[in-house]
Amino acid sequence: MFIISETQRTFASFFIFGLLNNILYVIILSAAIDLVGPSTPKAIVLLADIIPSFSFKVAAPFFIHAVPYIIRLWTLVALSATGMVLISLSPTNVISWKILGITLASLSSGLGEVSFLQLTHYYEENSAIGGFSSGTGGAGLFGSFLFMVLTNVMGFPVWVVLLICAVFPSGFIITYFNLLPLPMHEYQVILQQQQEREEEQEEEEYQQQLQDEARSQNIESIREVKYSVNYISKHVQNTIHKITPLILPYMLPLTTVYISEYVINQGISPTLLFPLKEVPRWLISSYRDIYVVYGFLYQLGVFISRSSVTMGIRIKRLYLLSVLQFINVMITLYQSIYDLPFHSIWWLFLLIFYEGLLGGASYVNTFKSVSEQVSRTKREFSMGCVSISDSLGIVTAGCINWWLELKLCHLQVARGRDWCLKGGSL
C-alpha cells in the first residue's frame, strides 16, 4: 500500500488549494477577448476580475481573524461556482451579467488567497508555502492550457468550457476534509480577547485608555467602550501601524512587478500580432488565438518559477525582478509600435515565457522572505497583508490598459494594420 508522509500531504493539499483558487481567474482572463470582443479593452475583464478580490484583501486584515476557516471555505465555493454559471449562461449581448459573474469569482479568489496564505502559518513552511505557490502557478499553466486546447484545438464553444469550470471549486471541500493533515499547532477563531493576549505589548496601552474612558464617562462596562467609534478608530490605527513595515521590503517590489507584467499581458499583447501565414497554423487559426497562446506561455513561465523555491532556488533581491520586468514592458511596447526588434512571433513567444518566469519568481520569493524574516507571532497577519500587493499591481495595470490597448490599436490601424480589431466573441 502506498503511504505518503504528512509533509507530502501538506504540499499536495496546498498545491490543490492554490490550483483551484487561481484557475478560474486564469480561465476568465484567457476568455477575455471572447467575453467582450476584440474592439473592447480587455481591461474591462481584468478590472472586474481583480478589483473585488483586491478590495476584499484590503479590508480583510480588519475582520478576517473572526471568521472560522470552514466558513471561509464554503463561502468561496458558493461564490466561485455561482460566478462561473452566470458568466457561461448569460446572454451574449448582456455584458453586465458576465461582469457580475466575474465579480463573484473574483471575491472568491481574494477570500481564498488570504485564507490559504494565513493557513500556511500552521504547517511546515516549505511544504505549505511551496505547495500553494506551485499550485497558483499550476493554475495558470493548467487553466490556460485547458482553455487553449478546448477552444483553439478542439473547437469547443467558450460558454461550454466556462460552465464545466463551475464544478472545480468542489475540490476545496474534498481536499480540506480528506487530504489536508492536522495542523502542527491548533488554529481557532481569533476573537478580540485572544488577539489582545497575542499582542500584549501593543494592546495594553489601548486597554488602559479604554478603562480610563469607561471610568470618566461612568459607562457600565469596558465592553461597551471596546466597540465604540473610538475603539474602532484605535484598532484601525493599530492595524495600519503593523502594515507599514511591510510596504518597502515586500509589498512595493511585488506590486511593481505585477504592474509591468499585466500591462504586457492585457494592454500590449493583444496588439503583438503577426500575419496568420507566418504563425503555426496547427495552433493558431485567428488573431484571437494568438492572445490565448501568449497567455499560456506566460503561465508556463509562472508555474516553473513559482515551483523553484521547493528546489532550493532563492532570489532575495526583489527589486531586481521589478527592473527586469519593466525592461520587458519597454521591449514589447516598442514591438507594438514599430514591429521591432522581433520579425518572428517565436521570439515574442520566448519573451512572454521569460516574463512569466520573472513574475512567478517575484511572487514566491516575496512570500518566502516574509516567512523567513517576520516573527512567528506576526507572520499570519503579514502573509495576509502582503497578498494585497499583486492585486494592487493588477488594478493599477488595468487602469493603464484601459487607455493603452486602444491607443496602440489605433496606431496600428493608422498605418494599415487592422489585425487588432479582428477576433472572436462568446
Swiss-Prot record:
Protein role: Involved in vacuolar transport and vacuole pH homeostasis. Also required for cytokinesis.
Any one GO CC term of the record: fungal-type vacuole
Transmembrane intervals: 44-64, 67-87, 99-119, 129-149, 154-174, 243-263, 290-310, 318-338, 340-360, 384-404
Keywords assigned by UniProt, alphabetized: Amino-acid transport, Membrane, Signal, Transmembrane, Transmembrane helix, Transport, Vacuole
Topology versus the membrane: Multi-pass membrane protein
Name of the protein: Protein BTN1
Keyword Membrane: yes
Gene responsible for this protein: BTN1
Pfam families documented for this protein: CLN3
Localization of this protein: Vacuole membrane
Signal peptide start-end: 1-32
Single Gene Ontology BP annotation: lysine transport
Domain of life: Eukaryota
High-level lineage: Eukaryota, Fungi, Dikarya, Ascomycota, Saccharomycotina
Similarity section: Belongs to the battenin family.
Alphabetized InterPro entries for the sequence: Battenin_disease_Cln3, Battenin_disease_Cln3_subgr, MFS_trans_sf
